Amino acid sequence: MNQEIRERTKWFMNDRFGMFIHWGLYSIPACGEWVMSFKEMTVEDYRPYFEQFDPVDYDPKKWVRLAKEAGMKYVVLTAKHHDGFCLFDSKLTEYKATNTKAGRDLVREFVDACREEGLKVGLYFSIIDWSHPDFPKYGDRQHPMRNNLAYKDEQINFDRYLDFMHGQIEELVTNYGKLDLLWFDFSYDNMTGETWRATELIKMVRKHQPDVIIDNRLEGAGDNHGSIATEHPLIYSGDFASPEQIIPPHGVCDVNGEPIPWELCATMNNHWGYCNFDHQYKTPQMLIRKLVECVSKGGNMILNVGPDAKGNIPEESVKILQEIGKWMKKNKDSIYGCGISRLEKPDWGRYTQKGNAIYAHVYETPLGALPLYGIAPDKLERVTYLADGSIVNRGEAWNTALYTDVAFVSFGEDPVFTYPLPDEKDTVLEIHLKE
C-alpha cells in the first residue's frame, strides 16, 4: 500500500463502521433495487415510478441521527443507481429528483445533514445506466433489454455515454463541498477499467477532491478485487476493496502479505433497496459479531438500510440499529481504531487490538474459567469489563494448574463454576498487560 493511500484512508480505518443507504424510484415497487433488470422493464415501463415519486417523509437528519446513534461514523447515499435516476440536481439529465414531486435536490439535504451531525459524507454512483440510450443493451447480461431483439443491431455511441457519466461525477465532486468517500458500482466482464476511461476519470476526481477515498469497482466488483492487491495496482484500482455479503476468511492482503483497507458491504435483510416482503432480518447480535469479525481482520463494515418510497427507514432496521447502538455506546473502544490482534483467534470469540490495548470479544459462556489464549499469567496485570470498567476476576484455580502458559479469568466468584455472560451479544474484556 503506497503512502498516499495510507494517509487518505487513516480516518476510514479508524472509523470502521458506516451506513449505506439504497434509495430511489425502485422503492416504489418495493421489491428491491434491481427490479428494472429482473423484470426486464423498458424505460417506458419504469417511467410511472418517476411520475409517482413523492417522498413526503424524507428527512435525512433523521437518517443521519440514527446512524450516529448506532455508532456509525460515515454514511453513503446512492446519488444514482443503475436505473439512471438521480437524487441530485444534475444539469445533464431531466431524470432527477428535482423534476419529480419531491421538487428539490435530495443529495444536497443529505450532505448537509451529515456535516451537521459530524459524520463523514459518502456518495454512491452507478457507472452503469440502464436509462441512457448509449449504454449497451442487447447481450449485456445486466441490462433490462439484454434479451430484447429490438436492440440487437442498435448503433450506440458509448463515448457519448462516458462523457455524460464523467460529467455527472464531476457535478458531484464540484457542487457538494468536500466529499470523504466515493463508492462507484460496478465493473463486470469487459466493462472494466479503461472501458470506463477510468484513468481520465480518476485524474478528474483527484483534481477536485484530492483526499476523497474511492472503492475498487472501476476495476473490480464484489466478486474480485481488481489490481488493488497486486505488486503494481493501477491508478483506478481504488483505495479499498469491497467484498459484498461475505467476510474474507483471512481479511484482504496484498501480494506481500500486507493488509490493505477493505470494507464489507452488507444488507440487514436480503435486499439493498426497500422490499416490503423481505423480513429475513439479521439479528443485532449477528451484526455486532460480524462487525467485530471485520475489525479483527483489518476491515470495515458498511451496513445498509433501504428506506421506503416515502423516505422512512423500515421499523425493523431502526430497532436493529438502536440495539447495535446500545452495545456500541459501551464497547466502541474495541471497534474504533482497532484492527488485527497479534493473538490468534480464540474458540470462544475474537480479539481486536489497538496499539497495546487488547480486547477480548467473548461470545460463548465458558465451562468454568475463560482461557485468555496467547497471554501468559505472569504478563497479565488486570482485566476489566469494557462496558463499565469493573474488574474481571482472575480464574486460575486447582483445575487450571496444568495449563501454566495461559491466563484465566472468571465471570463469577468461584472460577470452577459456570456463570452467564454479562452481555450475551458480545461481552468485551479489556486486557491490560504488564509493561
Model-flagged regions — what are they?
Residues 1-435:
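Mature catalytic domains of secreted/periplasmic carbohydrate-active enzymes
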